[in-house]
Design a protein with these regions (language model features):
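Substrate-gripping "pore-loop 1 plus following alpha2 helix"
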Residues: 57-71, 98-117, 161-170
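AAA+/SF3 P-loop NTPase mechanochemical coupling elements
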Residues: 73-80, 111-130
């Protein structure tokens, strides 16, 4: 998936290792970017399988600046999680950098499940976002961009004979 780039392979291993820890050694928002058919989804599904109940999937709207809710209930599902994944961002999505920094920064957030009481959430999840397009974010938000890591998935497997059972094999 990395096209043989040893540095990217090592970084993916380090990131996966971070998801095994109860604390968060670094504030990282990892974007996996590629044109499709490049292994992003297989990689994410594999790490989600390994982590089991320690991972959660968020909708792309969770980090959208057009979201209307003042206290989002979707981040409540991050309680006790070590990995939060988001897949397939729309091309025109504008990132709510405050929300993303809140998830990735480790500061206590106010959260609630739908129709339930508010509670304090101390997010520990690493944020992993797979997309074909890098979303727009306020270019002046230095704290957001300090956290962002971009990893390109340059190999397209649809040009070759793809292993249709690879996801199952990796489990």
């Amino acid at each position: 998936v990395t096209g043989g780039d040893a540095a990217n392979e090592a970084y993916l291993q380090k990131f996966c290792g971070y998801t095994l820890l109860a604390n968060r050694p670094e504030q990282i928002i990892l974007f996996l970017i590629g044109d499709g058919g490049d292994g992003k989804s297989v990689f994410i599904e594999t790490i989600k399988h390994v982590l089991g109940d320690y991972q959660a999937t968020l909708a792309a709207t969770s980090i959208s600046s057009s979201k209307k809710s003042s206290i989002p209930n979707d981040i409540a599902k991050l309680r006790g999680k070590r990995l939060a994944t988001i897949s397939e961002l729309p091309k025109d999505l504008h990132v709510d950098t405050q929300m993303v920094k809140g998830i990735s920064g480790g500061d206590t957030q106010t959260a609630r499940f739908l129709h339930q009481e508010y509670f304090d959430l101390d997010p520990h999840a690493q944020l992993l976002i797979a997309t074909n397009f890098y979303p727009y974010a306020n270019p002046e938000d230095k704290a957001y961009f300090r956290r962002v890591e971009i990893m390109r998935f340059p190999v397209c497997f649809t040009d070759k004979q793809p292993d249709k059972h690879l996801a199952q094999t990796l489990r």
